[in-house]
Amino acid sequence: MVLKNFILSGLVSVVCVGSLQAAEDVDIAATDPTELATKAWVALKAGDHELVSELTTQCFEEFGDDAVRQQKESGEEISKENASSFPELNSVGTCLFILAESLSQQGYDEKCQATLKKLITDFPECHCANKQGYYWKPAMAAEKRLAE
């Protein structure tokens, strides 16, 4: 239980694979998938749920098709050694997790659960790295969250 709470509470401070240093001034015009995910984490940490929604929607619209293709075509298991080869998959999956957390914080539990289920079903192999470089799988965290 302590580990589960630690993982869930610590997720807000993690940064997506290949993340860039986030500036204080979040510019939604970013077109790099990892930058969008990083900025979405920053917005979530700041409690800016409207910006989380905008950034995650932009990520889905611009990179969703590529993420689906990467998930389907990744005949190999994605691991920490090759995770950076799948930036769209990692960013879209991570953005789903961020969006679910934002929805939960706003009290939209049913939407949160639906978003977590979509992450588990559509992007089970996405990876994310924390600031220390340790990888975790948002889909696994989503499964734990749904089991609560």
Describe these PLM feature segments.
Residues 28-31, 85-86, 90-92, 137:
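Residue signature of alpha-solenoid helical repeat architecture, marking inter-repeat boundaries
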Residues 62-70, 122-130:
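Alpha-helical junction/boundary sensor with strong preference for TPR arrays
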